[in-house]
């Protein structure tokens, strides 16, 4: 490239200064690159005329920023301006005079081009066939610069509500000249692209804010010479702050020219900010081999970084990576450099905060050594370090690097990796996430905290020495992850703690989605506000997973100790975990073994959690199914149940049996319990209706004369059913209306009538709930013979509607409905012993039966219930006793008492998912009742009674019957 000295005549300089000052003050447009054309002679690129040449052909530059604008083109502030081309702060940055503000402020402006701290330049023929740079020029003035580095004189660049788009990539112009009398023209291109929007080689503080957009930033370590600097008190410091803004990649090529093979899309050319994938850099940091370390800190808040971040470091010139002998004894004893190790190390610390997002790769190019004499390690190598002898055995992974690259994501920020990213440390905090798909990520350590996530998708690969999943964070490997020859997650140690989750949701027969030597499921030493110690979770979902690693938990069962807690192994019921251990023996020559290896495949205490729930599946699908196998008879690990899971009709939990863990069958699920309890609950409603009809007939034989009539009764009750399999609580409320008449027949007086009953039931147990509706039609009769023997009989038809709902163990709502029809009968016989004119004692016996026929139905969770013929018989022997108090011809009060033995015979079972399950309710019980009937007039009376029945599978805690009748 040619050196090009910018010489201007006094009149031109004065004019330029005046125009620049005026344009900046009035927010105008201006160009930094122009072409001065002599229309007679042709431009000769290799011998271009000097700027200011009268009648010359030359490219002219007018874009320097000075502290004192009388010296040049621009002052230090742009507001509302539009700039086309390159802005150079070279003379501003090299003016170290006292009270000189080394600062450039750009607000509310558009820079079509770039800002550089270097001398501006361009190429008229950038590359040859081999890609080598060819002809070009750089531009400078007569201004004197200080060539010494002044540490602390940091250039501040403030960019607010401004776009710097790196989109001025070339000066296009037409050169006119005479060929004889003929005027000819050539189209020329002067390539001025910087590759990024901001290109600085001075210590810099860059502040980008207020919806700004910058197409790339490149910071390099420029001149560090100052003969007065002889101590280690100096570092080259760069700071970038991006708030509410976007930094994208730039371009080294002319994107709107077909010369570089670029094509448009419907007339729209590419833009420098269009991220083209790995290799398209948005930020680069390049340290030189000076004596001083380069420290770079980048902070983004609510901002977007679209492009790669490249970090290049080499050894300081005073550091010896191989070591040397400092005292002449023939033994290497020092690496030189500064005493403070950190001053021998370049740094790039990139922090994304407040919902910021980065799409791109971390490009990492540093030097490293394992020959450490008087420096401490500062990084790990993804490979290994070896013995310095003929054996060359693996001894370590610790190295000393010339630079370290650390990435932190905070408060809901996101990094979508591309290409192959390498960093030293990666911390992901407070709901942030890293997504690795079709790319690779390597970091010495990866730490996730406070609900953050690392998602490894299709063709994503993550490599680290130690992965820590803390405080409800998640590392997820999903079915979309493509398995190849490499493991998609490789970590020497994985620690999952405090509710963190290693989530391996892969295809059922993927055996090694990740590889590790040690999987540690542990917990913190502090209990939550409920007194629980929250542990780490290893969740394999439905995978048939083989863990070729040691499973470790350092907790104890002793709740009085600070390390109380269990590791959690989670899976679905169709999953299976085989724990093989890492296969190591106590081999002290290997880094990953020696004293830290547990030898046995699993140690510690674990809870096993079954996460799925379903109504489908027979008992044989789940009962005693092996879900964990520890392939080590010496293992002392314990496994116990973390929960119960609804699987088919039953709940199941984990149970350890030796070195296996199986599904242990427990009680019915809430939804199965409700489904199987419905026939019994229907019977309870019908029994209340049967008792209501029975009360009507009993009352017709006592008190004032009853010639038949119309009656209406409320009935209700509460039931508790428990046969050892089903269990429920039921409330019933209903009403019956009837009409009957008295008929004198042969040797008996008859009451013949009909009734209709309507009832609602509410059955529940735990989360199970059934809403019941019942409609019943009755015909009934009673014959009272002259010898005081009586016989009561009834026939009925009932229809039951039942709507079922429940919540499964995984929180899923389930519902279903079923209808059934039933026929019933009742037969009662007894003898009235008269005690004087008013009292009576009536021994009796009765038998009743209800025969239900239900339909097949399926719940929303796929549990299938076959239609059931449910038969229920009740046998009762008892005695009634009462006394009538007559107050007048039309008024009387009859209180009465009932005591009976009841036997329910309901030996039934129902098919659920193909399994026969007992849902019959039977057994002996005692009935105790009290009641009264009061006649207000000859024709109008009221009655009430209450009963308790208990002792069988179904206890009737109470029932009540309140009614009125009108006698003909």
Curated annotation (Swiss-Prot):
Q: Which residues form the Autotransporter domain?
A: 703-968
Entry coiled-coil feature ranges? none
Q: Which residues form the signal peptide?
A: 1-27
- Which keywords belong to this entry? Signal
Q: Could you tell me which Gene3D superfamilies the record lists for this protein?
A: Autotransporter beta-domain (2.40.128.130)
Name the GO cellular-component terms.
outer membrane
* Disulfide pattern: none
A Pfam family annotated for this chain is: Autotransporter
Q: Which PANTHER family match?
A: C-TERMINAL REGION OF AIDA-LIKE PROTEIN, PTHR35037:SF2
Q: Which NCBIfam families match?
A: autotrans_barl (TIGR01414)
Please state what the protein is called.
Putative uncharacterized protein YaiT
Species for this entry: Escherichia coli (strain K12)
From the UniProt record, report the name of the gene that encodes this protein: yaiT
